[in-house]
Amino acid sequence: MKPSVILYKALPDDLLQRLQEHFTVHQVANLSPQTVEQNAAIFAEAEGLLGSNENVDAALLEKMPKLRATSTISVGYDNFDVDALTARKILLMHTPTVLTETVADTLMALVLSTARRVVEVAERVKAGGWTASIGPDWYGTDVHHKTLGIVGMGRIGMALAQRAHFGFNMPILYNARRHHKEAEERFNARYCDLDTLLQESDFVCLILPLTDETHHLFGAEQFAKMKSSAIFINAGRGPVVDENALIAALQKGEIHAAGLDVFEQEPLSVDSPLLSMANVVAVPHIGSATHETRYGMAACAVDNLIDALQGKVEKNCVNPHVAD
């Protein structure tokens, strides 16, 4: 008899078929208490869980006594109670490598669109505002040869540094938990403390996961240390930034502009002051959102769940010691 798994995110037909070759698959719309209650017998028997964008906490795990592995279609896993999973010896799988290049593309797009005011001036053209040769009020700022500060030199940080160094001749500063020898050798990146990075960078790109240590890592104190001409980019996790402090910094002119793919609350409230600022490019968490990459992430998540329930946890496992 095949193990039972719960799928709470739609999959392409071929990936669903692959999953069904290994498991009895039960599809649900979400992991809300109502859904769990209505499908209590299914949740009680499930050994695997696959999906994204839902909280997996201790309360849910209490309803799933046979759960052995959960696989998320994402690199981030701050919506999972890792301690609760680990205490119950449940493996947590994620997709850390598939989206690297695509998210780096998004970061570079935010750098370019904020510096060159692409969204703002495009809207002016659409509104009929281009009636004569453009003047300084349409101008942006250069990207090439400007200093890029990267906070978080992981896979995505490395991919961004590659684009910036080779494509735009940008000097690279970075701050991370440890020195990154490859970044220093390939991109001539310079490690520095966060204060130095903030003071010297023309673009500050934040690429950090959300943890207890990184929550509101960026606040009023950090924005005050940045150049008034600097542009802030966040494509990591929204709550790493104190959004009210960011809004205040933009309103006071402490920083020049911001390109944001993530927010403290998602979706972003329609009455957020960020949406009325011409110098803010706000996009709806599209970091990995291409057809190719989202398919690759889903395929990886399917393979991860198959591997995990077969006892193979050599890669993509957040808590591999559970399998020991």
From Swiss-Prot:
<dbReference type="InterPro" id="IPR023756">
    <property type="entry name" value="Glyo/OHPyrv_Rdtase_B"/>
</dbReference>
<dbReference type="GO" id="GO:0008465">
    <property type="term" value="F:hydroxypyruvate reductase (NADH) activity"/>
</dbReference>
<dbReference type="InterPro" id="IPR029753">
    <property type="entry name" value="D-isomer_DH_CS"/>
</dbReference>
<comment type="function">
    <text>Catalyzes the NADPH-dependent reduction of glyoxylate and hydroxypyruvate into glycolate and glycerate, respectively.</text>
</comment>
<feature type="active site">
    <location>
        <position position="266"/>
    </location>
</feature>
<dbReference type="Pfam" id="PF00389">
    <property type="entry name" value="2-Hacid_dh"/>
</dbReference>
<protein>
    <recommendedName>
        <fullName>Glyoxylate/hydroxypyruvate reductase B</fullName>
        <ecNumber>1.1.1.79</ecNumber>
        <ecNumber>1.1.1.81</ecNumber>
    </recommendedName>
</protein>
<feature type="active site">
    <location>
        <position position="237"/>
    </location>
</feature>
<dbReference type="GO" id="GO:0030267">
    <property type="term" value="F:glyoxylate reductase (NADPH) activity"/>
</dbReference>
<keyword id="KW-0520">NAD</keyword>
<comment type="similarity">
    <text>Belongs to the D-isomer specific 2-hydroxyacid dehydrogenase family. GhrB subfamily.</text>
</comment>
<keyword id="KW-0521">NADP</keyword>
<dbReference type="InterPro" id="IPR006140">
    <property type="entry name" value="D-isomer_DH_NAD-bd"/>
</dbReference>
<keyword id="KW-0560">Oxidoreductase</keyword>
<dbReference type="InterPro" id="IPR036291">
    <property type="entry name" value="NAD(P)-bd_dom_sf"/>
</dbReference>
<dbReference type="Pfam" id="PF02826">
    <property type="entry name" value="2-Hacid_dh_C"/>
</dbReference>
<dbReference type="GO" id="GO:0005829">
    <property type="term" value="C:cytosol"/>
</dbReference>
<dbReference type="GO" id="GO:0120509">
    <property type="term" value="F:hydroxypyruvate reductase (NADPH) activity"/>
</dbReference>
<keyword id="KW-0963">Cytoplasm</keyword>
<comment type="subunit">
    <text>Homodimer.</text>
</comment>
<dbReference type="GO" id="GO:0051287">
    <property type="term" value="F:NAD binding"/>
</dbReference>
<dbReference type="GO" id="GO:0005886">
    <property type="term" value="C:plasma membrane"/>
</dbReference>
<dbReference type="InterPro" id="IPR006139">
    <property type="entry name" value="D-isomer_2_OHA_DH_cat_dom"/>
</dbReference>
<feature type="active site" description="Proton donor">
    <location>
        <position position="285"/>
    </location>
</feature>
<dbReference type="InterPro" id="IPR050223">
    <property type="entry name" value="D-isomer_2-hydroxyacid_DH"/>
</dbReference>
